[in-house]
Amino acid sequence: KKFDHTVDPSTLPVEEKGGAVVFSKDENGIVRFAMVHDVFGYWTLSKGGIDLGESPEEGTIREIKEEIGLDITIVEKLGENEYVAHHPEKGKIRKHVHYFLTESVYQPLVLAAGTGGLDQAKWFELSEIPELMMYDDVTKLIAGAIEKITMLTAAH
């Protein structure tokens, strides 16, 4: 039997992250999503590390403010996701991401300097979302978010 060199993920150090599907609904009822563009050419969700002593919600609110300059309100949790990544110092680590559906005022996005791996932040209308190049997990999260927003906005 060949020796298995794959690492058992449960033994790896965990990095907690918070991410958000950020939507805005303007006075005309137009729903838009705030997305960030990464250096690999994909539109993705703004996310960042949760500090020690912060709840996933608090960390996500702080990170979105730092990364794209928006004050967000958490509507509900969308789910969690975990993947193994390579850290320059620690080697292999588990990244555990908490995703939230969040709402914000429609205002210009300001991508912070030094947000590693990101080169753009932009709002997209609902109709533009299917055209975007996105990761599968992001597509699923946005699809779930759209369903929830449709239900929320129908109620008002």
PLM features per residue range, with description:
Residues 50-140:
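Unchanged
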Residues 44-47:
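A short gly/proline-enriched turn/hairpin at secondary-structure junctions
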Residues 1-28:
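Acidic, metal-coordinating catalytic segment for phosphate/diphosphate chemistry
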Residues 131-156:
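Charged phosphate-binding loop/patch that engages nucleotide di/tri-phosphates or the phosphate backbone
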Residues 19, 32, 120:
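Conserved beta-strand and immediately adjacent loop positions that scaffold enzyme active sites
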Residues 26-32, 89-92:
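Short, solvent-exposed loop/turn segments that connect beta-strands within catalytic domains
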Residues 34-37:
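Short, acidic/hydrophobic/Gly-rich beta-strand patch recurrent on exposed beta strands
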Residues 15-18, 40, 94-97:
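Short connector loops at helix/strand junctions that flank enzyme active sites
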